[in-house]
């Protein structure tokens, strides 16, 4: 067997402590859950929904039609329910786990990474959300995020969700014209970007590309 083939078959066994904290302890346990989700989807997803905080509980779990012979394809989830996904992701963890790490970020270059606790992340998300509101972004508006893989990316995503805005993460390798087209098609209300980033050893002028995209939008009457 070649070294490449050996590498493909190399397994990394987690520690017992790490494995015991897993939500699923075995493949058979996963298969059992999967079968339950297929057999009775509403019951399964109702149990999942009960693990979330709801300001108002949903009236139904799901309503859908995937048969075009019976009408237009449609899917609705948790009709009548009201919650905020960032409350579930951040706020409800602050009291007991605020000092725990929410995520680690490892940079492209060989410099120190960053670890943000739930408390730190919550503060930054609220700041970003309020900044968007100050700019006039409101519930239902589309916000494009044209950024490299930096900590501010998930912060921007969560900030949009916190105020009910729809975020669209745009691939950082797109041209200014492609970015412009997507902004126009989605009737984008705001664009969040960064000064630049590394791609390998090359510096990519993200902000310059974003500025060109905005100029293109304006030239097209958007």
Regions found by a protein language model. Name each.
Residues 6-32:
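Short, contiguous pre-domain boundary segments
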Residues 86, 103-158, 175-180:
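Conserved AMP-binding/adenylate-forming core of the ANL superfamily
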């Amino acid at each position: 067997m070649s070294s490449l083939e050996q590498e493909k078959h190399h397994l990394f066994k987690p520690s017992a402590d790490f494995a015991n904290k897993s939500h699923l302890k075995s493949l058979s346990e996963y298969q059992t859950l999967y079968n339950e989700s297929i057999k009775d989807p509403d019951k399964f997803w109702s149990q999942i929904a009960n693990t979330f905080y709801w300001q108002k509980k949903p009236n139904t779990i799901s309503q859908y039609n995937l048969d075009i012979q019976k009408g237009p394809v449609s899917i609705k989830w948790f009709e009548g329910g009201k919650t905020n996904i960032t409350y579930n992701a951040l706020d409800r963890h602050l009291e007991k786990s605020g000092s725990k790490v929410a995520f680690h970020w490892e940079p492209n270059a060989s410099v120190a990474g960053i670890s943000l606790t739930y408390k730190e992340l919550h503060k930054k998300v609220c700041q970003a959300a309020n900044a968007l509101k100050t700019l006039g972004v409101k519930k239902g508006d589309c916000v494009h995020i044209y950024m490299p893989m930096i900590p501010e990316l998930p912060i921007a995503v969560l900030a949009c969700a916190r105020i009910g805005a729809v975020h669209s993460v745009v691939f950082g390798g797109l041209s200014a014209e492609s970015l412009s087209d997507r902004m126009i098609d989605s009737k984008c209300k705001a664009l969040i970007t960064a000064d630049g980033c590394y791609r390998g050893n090359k510096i990519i002028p993200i902000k310059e590309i974003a500025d060109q995209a905005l100029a293109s939008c304006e030239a097209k009457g958007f």
